[in-house]
Amino acid sequence: MSTVPVVQGAGSSNSAQDISTSSVPLTLQGRISNLLSSTAFKVGLVVMGLLLVMATIFLVSAASFVNPIYLAIPAIVGCVNICVGILSMEGYCSPERWSLCKKVLKASEDIIDDGQINNSNKVFTDERLNAIGGVVESLSRRNSLVDQTQ
């Protein structure tokens, strides 16, 4: 790590007074990008999603008198968290990962809405997931290009 003295021409024995030229301070966007691309954040998304799904299943079974659609919202958010974590785990999304996430989202909605897997989806329909698939594919291509340049 190279340093530049604070006062030009005067060397310093105290490295705290020197300004580092090798490390550029990160902007807010750079720090957020580093956080979002960290493995800990992605694993945290998956864990948070699992916790939301489990909490919703527990609440639906405990509170049968409440409208279950309000309790399904955390589960849907949890499933989306799980899928985002899975899709972004290595920086790109393969077609196999995307098909796995589509199956998870569709099955979780089926189980949450009426307890049976009968393809009665209203939120995660094939049309909506296919539309999202185009966005996922383009983001995946962009992320793989960024990874190749680094």
Swiss-Prot record:
One of its GO terms (cellular component) is outer membrane. The chain crosses the membrane at residues 43-63, 69-89. Coiled coil: none annotated. It is a multi-pass membrane protein. It holds the Pfam family CRPA. Signal peptide: none annotated. It is found in: Membrane. Keywords: Membrane, Transmembrane, Transmembrane helix. Its main location: membrane. Residues 1-20 are annotated as: Disordered. This is Sulfur-rich protein, serovars L1/L3. The lineage of its organism: Bacteria, Pseudomonadati, Chlamydiota, Chlamydiia, Chlamydiales.
